[in-house]
Amino acid sequence: MKKRALYSICLLLSGSLTAWGQSDPIAIFHNDLRVFLGENGATKAPTGSADMWLSVEQENEWIPLIFQSGLWLGGLDDESTLLVTDLTEGGQPGTLEAPEGFDRIWQVTAEEIEQHRADLADNGLVDEPLEAIYGWPAVGNPHFLDYSGFELPDSPLAGLAPFWDQNADGLYDPDDGDFPILSVRGCDIPIIPTQMSWCIFTMFMDQEQVRPIECQLILFTFACEEAHPLNNTIFLHYRLVHRVEPGGSALFDTRLGWYLDPDLGCLLDDYVGSFPDRFAGFAYNRSNEDVGCESLPGLGTNPPAIGFDLLRGPLTIENNELVDVDISHIMPFYSPIFGSFPSGTTDPSNLSEYYNYLQGFWRDGTPLTVGGIGYGGSQTTQFAFPGFPAQPGAWTEWEANNPDGDRRLLMAYEPFELQAGAVNEVIAAITLYRDGADHLDQVVGLRDQLDQVQAYYDLCFQVENAGDLPPCTQVLTDVGEPAPAAHWSFFPNPAFQTLQIDIPDQKRGDLALYDLTGRLCASWAEIEDETAIQLGALPPGLYVLTLTDSQGRQSSQKLLVVQ
């Protein structure tokens, strides 16, 4: 079927020869796309399977799109020792302090989140708790042990799974109105994809395991009722934490890249290219008929093009401020098994060769150059095969009539210093376009679709209120931004007979008191700010007090009544 040559070096680069989390990955379905995710963060084809990492369904058959993908990270320690790790194969499931129990993937849908919010809103209590919500691995979750069978670590640097913190106490509790979200730096509004799959794993950049990289990975999608670009797009959100010991050294001349191995049906007849001004890469078919090969089915007539977009990358410090690291290069390299390519352009086999590619050089250290396959020329460049395939006189694989073979693509950033404890985000999108007139026109439409994907990201994925962009009505759910909580307080707590209510913002509201079965025990209409209410002869115990303010916003707090 497909090559396995890159696998052995990937295991070596993991920093440990221990086989972490090698059980089968789960399949995630989105529209007619299928992608796999390993509980250890692996983003590759299932081991020993004829399946690809990403496939599309055509006529009841899964057709290949991408064999595998993953982040590469490399740099120099304070003794100038080269360290490189490859996240394609994943790592040790769990956080650095608590690996046990994390050999699984947590999944949640927008429908479940909306159901939870509606359940809480009707009476201030959750009557039908959902496992996806109550078992979400977020910091402070008091229900996690009951649903998952093990305790969460106390204070991981990366904060575990992201959530909407309704009362801003820093702890996740669905009973307080909290719920899972996608958290993106700079976006202060909750992002609720149609589906999210979350895992956490740890990579070690050295055999001594003293330089760990803790990684959270969320694979997320938006499913729209309309015919929409997001129906053909999957997103990857990495959060990387450099978990060296306190006082540990930085990683210098750090390079971060995204590696992809596209196989559009037959793996031998694909071309690749780049849109440098968008920092996006793509793959397309060299002919308008994709016939199966090497036991892989083809995509048939007018095969689609697929695009790869890095929406967010690492940060560095300049003039005491955090700034985004600029793009560096997009370049291909080639399989040594399929096709006849110079050995200096094929898969890396040691740390130095990986680092060469991360720096924008070929495996043998020579630069990427204009012309042919990008090797051995005199004019150096950073971006291979830029622009649309059909450009007379331009350097593209189509115009160069490059030979058949199995291509990979690497998209990388400029060097930066990875400080001890640094937290970086990488957000990547993979989008399929198939509405073009032919295999070359697919790339023209793909560029516009990549622009739309970037625009949704720029709007913090508020897909249902996206201005001039095509609206996306999420399938099976109606999710909007949650109303801000009513601002109020009461004291004392615990209380005996009298309770004072403070509503400083709205000055008045309606108050309801429920017991833990959801039964309404008492209510007060038009309560004003700084009002004392009488609790009467309530039995001692725990209650829920819900305020509805003059704008219809609700907020619930727990009240302990004592004798």
Cite the ranges covered by each PLM segment:
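Bacterial Sec-dependent N-terminal signal peptides
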Residues: 1-25, 476-480
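Single, functionally critical "micro-switch" positions that shape active/binding sites
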Residues: 16, 168, 420, 491-492
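A long-range scaffold signal marking pre-active-site subdomains of enzyme folds
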Residues: 22-475
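Conserved beta-strand and immediately adjacent loop positions that scaffold enzyme active sites
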Residues: 160, 237, 480, 510, ...
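Residue-level detector of functionally pivotal "anchor" positions at catalytic/ligand-binding pockets or at interdomain
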Residues: 463-491, 506
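C-terminal outer-membrane/trafficking sorting elements
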Residues: 483-563
